[in-house]
Structures are given as structure tokens and as C-alpha cells.
Amino acid sequence: NIERPEMEKRDTILKVVDLTVDKSDGSIALDDVSFEIKTGEILGVAGVAGSGQKELCETLTGLMTAKKGAILYHKENIVGKTPAEIIKLGISMSFVPEDRLGMGLVASMGMVDNMLLKSYTEGKGPFVERKPARELAQKLVEKLAIVTPGVDTPVRLMSGGNVQKVLLGREIESSPQVLITAYPVRGLDINSSYTIYDLLNEQKKKGVAVIYIGEDLDVLLELSDRLMVLCHVKVTGVVDAKTVTKEQIGLMMTGAEAAEAMKETSGQELSADQDK
């Protein structure tokens, strides 16, 4: 079983209101999406592939621009701001994208240079300090048991699990207040997957708000505190992961609103009981 630590006092850190986003071809990527996430919480996101998960991540991090709506970070609206402008506001957000070696890391570079990619935006002068990046790379190798011939070996030569540890490790080390992860265990073996779940729970215990986009419903139900379901670029519900069932999530993934899904499945349970 995956651990789900219980956190006390939690405050809303990010509130999304009526977010509508268009794709470059003019079709709708997100339609009137609203939700909030608290500190020390894992909000799972479930949905059939292509329901708006990728666009949600990219809009929250400033890589895509919303057509309407607001993303309130501690009540400050960050819609329309670039990732660099978001950093300048003192907002600490980390993103672990689905495309690890295309968007997350540079495949031909080693760990050290990939650490530098994150830190150079925060550098104060014209010179890049390699020493802290090398120390960080070595620290991650030890802490996360990353298997690599060396910290300068191109990351494309590593296994998928090790690549993901490098990426998530780097993003966590920047001490984010919000951590957005898209399919972080896709293609990983069970041991690597549990390492990732532990890392996410560690962040939760530090008070980080974690958005976890996943495809395995069992994992989503065990790891998340609340679960948001997307269907055809709309939110069909945000529910308590401890009490909702897999069947209810399945109904919501095919378009049933949360209240409707709860009613329908409780009706099925009643008739099943009567048949006994």
C-alpha cells in the first residue's frame, strides 16, 4: 500500500477560477475549469488521455496562456505571465512534465548541466557556477540511489526510472511551494515507482501543494487526498479520494457529474443488497 500521511492545518495556496484555454488550432483545451489546492495536499487528476491534463499543467506554469479565467497564487492572478515573470514574483513552482527528455531534461547533457538549467534563471551574475550544480548532482545520486556511470554521462543513457529520479530530484531541490507532476511513474518498475511516491509524500509533509496527474486509478485513490476528474476538457468533479470508489471515478471519467456518479453507484449497491 502507498502511504497517505494526514496533514493538519492547511491553507489554500492556488485557486483556479473558470479557466478556459484554447489550443493553437482554435479547439478548446480546457473549458471553464475551477478548483483549488491546499498546502500539504496531494490533488490527484484523473481522466482519459487527452482530457486536458497536459494543457492544465502548461497553463498553470505559464507555458500556455488562458483565454479567460484566473489562476490565483496566494490571491495574485498569474494568468498571462511567463515562467520567468512567475519566478520574479517570488512564486516557487516546479513542473515535472510528461516528456522527460524533451521538455524536462536535455538528453545529451549530463546531470551537472541539467542541474544548471534550473539554477541559471536564479543566478545573479553573468557567470554560471558549476560547483553547486556538481554537488547537487552528487547529492541526488546518493539520496535517490541513481544508477549512472557518472554525473557528466548524458542522461539519455540512463534507464527511465533513473531519468525520472534526476528530473524530480532537481525540481524538489528548488524547494517549491507548488509541485506539478505529469505521469511521473509512467514506464517505471515498481521499486522506482514507490521511490517517486515517497518523494511526493515527503514534499507533502513539508507543506508543498502537489498536483499529481496519473493514469492508474488504484494509485490515484491511495496517494491523493482529493481527486479531480477531467472529461472532454471539463471538470466533472473534485472528490475525497478516501471515500470515492473506482466505479464512481470511472463514471466521472466518461462524463457523469460527481453527484450523478455517487447516486448511480449507490443505487447499484442497494439493488445488489436487495438481490442477496
Which residue ranges define each predicted feature?
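Glycine-rich phosphate-binding loops of nucleotide-dependent enzymes
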Residues: 1-276
